Amino acid sequence: MKRTWQPNRRKRAKTHGFRARMKTKSGRKVLKRRRQKGRHRLTV
């Protein structure tokens, strides 16, 4: 059986990257929450 984690840097950034988060309203909410929480890394 194929494993679920097939590393791919490009896909990772395109799905969870900063610009991907900024594109949608909900993504911006994610960043807002993470800033509020004080995360050092907002995105991947």
UniProtKB/Swiss-Prot annotation:
InterPro entries attached to this UniProt entry: Ribosomal_bL34 (IPR000271), Ribosomal_bL34_CS (IPR020939)
Top-rank taxon, per record: Bacteria
GO CC annotations, alphabetized: ribonucleoprotein complex; ribosome
Keywords associated with the record: Ribonucleoprotein, Ribosomal protein
Keyword presence, Ribonucleoprotein: yes
Single GO term (MF): structural constituent of ribosome
Region of interest (Disordered), ranges: 1-44
PROSITE patterns for the chain: RIBOSOMAL_L34
A GO biological-process term: translation
Quaternary state and interactors: Part of the 50S ribosomal subunit.
PANTHER family linked: LARGE RIBOSOMAL SUBUNIT PROTEIN BL34M, MITOCHONDRIAL RIBOSOMAL PROTEIN 34 FAMILY MEMBER
Record HAMAP family: Ribosomal_bL34 (MF_00391)
NCBIfam families reported in the protein's UniProt record: rpmH_bact (TIGR01030)
Family assignment from sequence similarity: Belongs to the bacterial ribosomal protein bL34 family.
Note: The open reading frame (ORF) for this protein is entirely within the ORF for the RNase P protein (RnaP). The two start codons are separated by four nucleotides.
Record protein name field: Large ribosomal subunit protein bL34
